[in-house]
């Protein structure tokens, strides 16, 4: 399955140890998402539509209320790059 450039960028950051933080409203609906790199910087390019697409493809998952991380399926989809760890 091919993934688009924006998805590839986010998955690459997550493969290096990044995470996705979410904000919810009082009805527990997701209102905002932010991709945080392993260094603690906020990366651009992630919106709610892209977040839902990655979640639907099972590339990211959250366990126990923790931030979203890349899954094994996401690691298989991300193309290797020289600085991936």
Language model: regions and residue ranges:
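Short hydrophobic/aromatic segments of transmembrane alpha-helices and their interfaces
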Residues: 34, 50-51, 59-60
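Short, charge-rich amphipathic interface segments used for partner binding and complex assembly
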Residues: 43-44, 52, 56
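A short, conserved structural fragment
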Residues: 55-65
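Minor-groove-contacting beta-hairpin "wing" of winged helix-turn-helix DNA-binding domains
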Residues: 66-71
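Short, amphipathic alpha-helical interaction segments positioned at domain boundaries
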Residues: 75-85
């Amino acid at each position: 399955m091919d993934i688009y450039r924006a998805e590839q960028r986010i998955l690459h950051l997550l493969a290096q140890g990044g995470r996705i933080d979410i904000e919810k409203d009082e009805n527990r609906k997701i209102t905002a998402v932010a991709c945080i790199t392993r260094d603690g910087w906020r990366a651009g390019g992630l919106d709610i539509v892209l977040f839902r697409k990655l979640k639907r493809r099972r590339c990211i998952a959250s366990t126990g209320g923790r931030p979203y991380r890349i899954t094994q399926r996401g690691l298989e989809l991300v193309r290797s790059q020289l600085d991936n760890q």
